[in-house]
Amino acid sequence: ATGLVTATAEGDPVLALSGQVKRSDLLRSSHQSMRNADLFAPITKYAAEVQDPDNVSEIIANAYQAAESGKQGASFVSIPQDVTDSPVNSEPIKPLVAPKLGPASPSDMTYLAHAIKEASLPVLLLGMRASSSDVTAEIRELLSVTELPVVETFQGAGIISHRQIDNFFGRVGLFRNQPGDMLLQHSDLVIAIGYDPVEYEPRNWNADGKARIIVIDDVPAEIDHNFQPETELIGDISQTLDILVPLLRGYQVAPGSKRYLEDLQAKLQDSDVPPAIADQKVLHPLSIVAALQERVTDEMTVAVDVGSHYIWMARHFRSYEPRHLLFSNGMQTLGVALPWAIAATLVRPGKKAVSVSGDGGFLFSGQELETAVRLHADLVHIIWNDGHYDMVKFQEEMKYGRAAGVDFGPVDFVKYAEAFGAKGLRVNKPSELGQVLDEAFATPGPVLVDIPVDYSDNAELGAAMLPDQIY
């Protein structure tokens, strides 16, 4: 269930097939009898149970279509044992051809181009549905001929390439206190492209509900008090952007806004610099991020688990290819990083993957090291180790003045890795970080690296938060 609700929240198309007791046992208190489809209905886009063998193909076809269409997500099909054993007399449904959308209305595109030119400081807010390869290419083309500033959500990471770095003002998500948040507050026109509220609730970046918003997407917006678009350009996003490019070619930010953007860009760059700490005993988060940044290449996939480390990574780790820096921002599912990294080595063969977790989150799926070893997955898993569920800990301390239920005993992660047949490494002091990471990245197959981390500066992560942002 956790995997499917994560897929639905994050917009990942998944089709799950499940066994079920035979139909005659469905209403009995028999072994393993439960209403599977009813259980999964609230957390999937489509959930059904096959009652007639001749309906199997129809149900599978509709489940597949639901998972792939609109806002993508999970579908679930339950198949009773006696249905599985029965002959099927009906013909299978022919392969589906997904409907193709055209661009948005020409009049709406003209309206948007005019609105951008009239605004003092328009900004693009790029979300997860803007991260497909074709949409990313059009966004990069648009930025090559305009000066439009850009903010990414965590799940929009990598849309901006090295060439558009001057247009980039960071990522926003979870806590409202970043340069990108300042830009959204200062802007008089937010163009939300492929943005989903689950990535970063509008109440966080548009608390007063006064932002002027125009949407470019392939699905209608989800409206609430803090997200009321002036207009929506609904259609194929890449085709819409392709038509917008000539309408906006040569656009420059208003002179009065350029100094503000220069100052904001300086803030963003300064925030990435690790602090100088004399006689450092345990590594600062920014030191770990910087060391990873030096070693991770653009073609590597980096999957990030949930925890304090994920906030530091989302804010400060730069990725320049779409869908190469992965976060679970919808459900914030603990344990996703290692399985995602294993999957990345399968869909991107020959490319090393990196997964990053806390010591608590790692133990939600650490057993998948066996899978990684069996598949010879070429990955490096980094554990930020502090002996706590720290993301919960620092928020409890901010809200209640103390923490409870967040501490656990030491785990020897090196021996844990070795027990599964993986290589285990540990950073025993800050000066060893570079050497240990070099060894890890040079080693083929699964490698686990245990890095002690100092989260003393975590209070800064939550600075200037709204009261209801503390979970």
Predicted segments with their positions:
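Generic enzyme active-site microenvironment
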Residues: V215, A303, V356-S357
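A short, charged, Gly/Pro-tolerant segment at domain boundaries
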Residues: F76-D85, Y260-Q269, V453-A459, M465-I470
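Active-site diphosphate/adenylate-binding microenvironment
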Residues: L264-P339, A344, K399
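Short glycine-rich anion-binding loops that position phosphate/pyrophosphate groups of nucleotides
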Residues: Q20-V21, Q81-D82, M128-S131, G156, ...
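A conditional alpha-helix N-cap/helix-loop micro-motif detector
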Residues: V56-S57, G102-M109, G173, V282-P285, ...
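Thiamine diphosphate
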Residues: L27-Q32, H162, F175, H186, ...
